[in-house]
Amino acid sequence: MAPKKIGAGKGDSSILAKISNYDIVSQGRRAACDAVYVSKKLLKSTGKAAWIAGTTFLILAVPLILELEQDHRLGEIDFEQASLLGTPPVGAML
């Protein structure tokens, strides 16, 4: 024979039914549903904003970074060639 569980009687279901009919419970459910709705909307708009920021960065900032890096490399190559040819660097003439 299975052991009797505490709180599994018929009286408990009627107590739960009575409690769930209270106005405060329905207000709590409504507040929870509203919070979920607002959270979903916020996540959706945050995702859109992140997409816009990411694509803007890729379109505008990445080419700029690559161009600056290439300019820096060309400057280093010019400096190295100047030092190999024996011409003094620009800062050494002062």
Curated annotation (Swiss-Prot):
Residue ranges, Mitochondrial intermembrane side: 67-94
Localization of this protein: Mitochondrion outer membrane
GO cellular component, one term: mitochondrial outer membrane translocase complex
Sorted UniProt keywords: Membrane, Mitochondrion, Mitochondrion outer membrane, Protein transport, Receptor, Signal-anchor, Translocation, Transmembrane, Transmembrane helix, Transport
Keyword flag Transport: yes
InterPro entries assigned to the protein according to its UniProt record, in alphabetical order: Tom22_pln (IPR017411)
GO MF terms held by the record: protein-transporting ATPase activity
Topology feature Cytoplasmic, residues: 1-48
Segments traversing the membrane: 49-66
Tissue: Expressed in roots, flowers, young cotyledons and leaves.
Bilayer topology: Single-pass type II membrane protein
GO BP of this protein: protein targeting to mitochondrion
Alphabetical list of PANTHER family matching this protein: MITOCHONDRIAL IMPORT RECEPTOR SUBUNIT TOM9-1, MITOCHONDRIAL IMPORT RECEPTOR SUBUNIT TOM9-2
Function of the molecule: Central component of the receptor complex responsible for the recognition and translocation of cytosolically synthesized mitochondrial preproteins. Together with TOM20 functions as the transit peptide receptor at the surface of the mitochondrion outer membrane and facilitates the movement of preproteins into the translocation pore.
Family, as annotated: Belongs to the Tom22 family.
Description of how the protein assembles with itself and partners: Forms part of the preprotein translocase complex of the outer mitochondrial membrane (TOM complex) which consists of at least 6 different proteins (TOM5, TOM6, TOM7, TOM20, TOM22/TOM9 and TOM40).
Entry protein name: Mitochondrial import receptor subunit TOM9-1
Organism: Arabidopsis thaliana
